[in-house]
Curated annotation (Swiss-Prot):
<dbReference type="GO" id="GO:0006633">
    <property type="term" value="P:fatty acid biosynthetic process"/>
</dbReference>
<keyword id="KW-0863">Zinc-finger</keyword>
<keyword id="KW-0276">Fatty acid metabolism</keyword>
<feature type="binding site">
    <location>
        <position position="29"/>
    </location>
    <ligand>
        <name>Zn(2+)</name>
    </ligand>
</feature>
<comment type="similarity">
    <text>Belongs to the AccD/PCCB family.</text>
</comment>
<protein>
    <recommendedName>
        <fullName>Acetyl-coenzyme A carboxylase carboxyl transferase subunit beta</fullName>
        <ecNumber>2.1.3.15</ecNumber>
    </recommendedName>
</protein>
<feature type="domain" description="CoA carboxyltransferase N-terminal">
    <location>
        <begin position="25"/>
        <end position="294"/>
    </location>
</feature>
<dbReference type="InterPro" id="IPR029045">
    <property type="entry name" value="ClpP/crotonase-like_dom_sf"/>
</dbReference>
<comment type="pathway">
    <text>Lipid metabolism; malonyl-CoA biosynthesis; malonyl-CoA from acetyl-CoA: step 1/1.</text>
</comment>
<feature type="binding site">
    <location>
        <position position="51"/>
    </location>
    <ligand>
        <name>Zn(2+)</name>
    </ligand>
</feature>
<dbReference type="Pfam" id="PF01039">
    <property type="entry name" value="Carboxyl_trans"/>
</dbReference>
<dbReference type="GO" id="GO:0003989">
    <property type="term" value="F:acetyl-CoA carboxylase activity"/>
</dbReference>
<dbReference type="GO" id="GO:0005524">
    <property type="term" value="F:ATP binding"/>
</dbReference>
<dbReference type="InterPro" id="IPR041010">
    <property type="entry name" value="Znf-ACC"/>
</dbReference>
<feature type="zinc finger region" description="C4-type">
    <location>
        <begin position="29"/>
        <end position="51"/>
    </location>
</feature>
<dbReference type="InterPro" id="IPR000438">
    <property type="entry name" value="Acetyl_CoA_COase_Trfase_b_su"/>
</dbReference>
<keyword id="KW-0275">Fatty acid biosynthesis</keyword>
């Protein structure tokens, strides 16, 4: 090839450019590692369409997709945590609170809403796991009690979505006290005969699983949710035995009778609406009440006349 041909060949080379793909359009499943379209995943309520893995979801997103659109009122939103003990581990507690509030845009780890589900009045609460592992502390307990009080005042059911690592160690005994506090509040729901439905999501551990999460009239879990008091790694190190496959997962607990149902997240709203309509003896909007009709057959009518005639003759 001559020098002139080399120049001509170089001039014909076209420059290629990388396509500018905006960030956040694609994401990867934590379980199957498949690349997923972000918008499709959001439409599926953060459930992987490939392997059905239920990813973690924020408390407000959960309540927004669960309750009817429109009039919802937040309860206890003004309550904020305080560092009464001046607790410090590797970091000051007040600094941990500030960092969690900045990350999640929430004041604490529980969000409570008053609204409707398929037209039925309900009070719903959801844990925010991104806020210090959804740990239960004074404000969480106070907001949960506020939810119970509102349900009692409105004479309506209470629903709670749990996702927590347990009691918050930075508040010591005050966080442990919330176990008794929330349990006592739920006893009032039972006295009034109002339904309390507990939905356990991944993970529900520690003091939350040992109190409000397991006290539902109906205990429901999402698929493959980790539910228990101590984690499987801690148990294995303590008993020095290999735990069975799927130990502490929702399927394992259902087989052992520890929970009542496993419901996929996309089906949760319709399932709970159906359950509450039966528990509260309300018909869902758009459904016709069942009317039992009895039509007497001619033979039955004749038999009744014959029986009454015989009685008169006697």
């Amino acid at each position: 090839m001559s020098w002139i041909e080399k120049i001509l060949n170089k001039s014909n080379i076209t420059q290629t450019r990388k396509a500018n793909i905006p960030e956040g359009v694609w994401t990867k499943c934590d379980s199957c590692s498949q690349v997923l379209y972000r918008a499709e995943l959001e439409r599926n309520l953060e459930v992987c369409p490939k392997c059905d893995h239920h990813m973690r979801i924020s408390a407000r997103t959960r309540l927004a997709t669960f309750l009817d659109e429109g009039a919802t009122t937040e309860l206890g939103g003004e309550l904020e945590p305080k560092d009464i003990l001046k607790f410090r581990d590797s970091k000051k507690y007040k600094d941990r609170i500030s960092a969690a509030q900045k990350q999640t845009q929430e004041k604490d780890a529980l969000v409570v809403m008053k609204g409707t589900l398929s037209g039925m009045s309900v009070v719903a609460a959801a844990f925010e796991f991104a806020f210090m592992g959804g740990s239960m502390a004074s404000v969480v307990g106070a907001r949960f009690v506020r939810a119970v009080e509102q349900a009692l005042a409105d004479n309506c059911p209470l629903i709670c979505f749990s996702s927590s690592g347990g009691a918050r160690m930075q508040e010591a005994l005050m966080s442990l006290m919330q176990m008794a506090k929330t349990s006592a509040a739920l006893a009032k729901m039972q006295e009034r005969g109002l339904p309390y439905i507990s939905i356990m999501t991944d993970p529900t551990m520690g003091g939350v699983s040992a109190s409000l999460a397991m006290l539902g009239d109906i205990n429901i879990a999402e698929p493959k949710a980790l539910i228990g008091f101590a984690g499987p790694r801690v148990i294995e190190q303590t008993v020095r035995e290999k735990l069975p496959s799927g130990f502490q997962r929702s399927e394992f607990l259902l087989a052992k009778g520890a929970i009542d149902m496993i419901v996929r997240r996309p089906e949760m709203r319709d399932t709970l609406a159906s359950l509450l309509s039966k528990l509260t003896h309300q018909s869902q909007p758009g459904t016709k009440p069942i009317v039992a009709e009895f039509v007497a057959e001619p033979a039955d009518v004749e038999a009744d006349i014959q029986i009454s005639t015989n009685k008169e003759d006697a």
